[in-house]
Amino acid sequence: MIIDTLQNAHKYYSVHPLFQPAFEYIAAQNLTAIETGKFDISDGLKVINNTAVGKTAEASVAKFECHNKNIDIQLCIKGDEQMGWKPRSKCVLPNGDYNEEKDVQLYLDQPDTFFSLTDHQFVIFFPEDVHAP
């Protein structure tokens, strides 16, 4: 997991080949007027924009998830977003089977750590990171 601000996003371009186009896409957007929905940017790179108000820690854990293939970059545009995290290796209570079509495994475990994102901060969740939301 990586937590940082958009100002430092360029430091992570070398971590994964899709990080640079993802962050360049974000930088080119008017974040205060961004549309809600799913958008394919390029092969293997999809943006899901959710403009909902940030969730509390309690509401976030209702969807405690991880992915086998995808990496999530989640951005707080404005406000305060509470998130939960736990290493996948410590999760022992799967909530159903892995959904290959959606690339998601849900867990009933509780996060080890809660943290907040505020204006223009992002988090990158890798497959070994179980996160909420």
Predicted regions and their residues:
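Short, conserved beta-strand element in jelly-roll/cupin
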Residues: 68-81, 87-89, 97-108
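A short local loop/turn or secondary-structure capping micro-motif enriched for an aromatic residue
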Residues: 56-57, 91-94, 133
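Beta-hairpin (beta-strand-turn-beta-strand) motif
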Residues: 52, 76-80, 86-90, 120, ...
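Conserved metal-binding segment of the jelly-roll/cupin
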Residues: 115-133
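A short, N-terminal "cap"/entry segment at the start of jelly-roll beta-barrel domains
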Residues: 1-48, 63
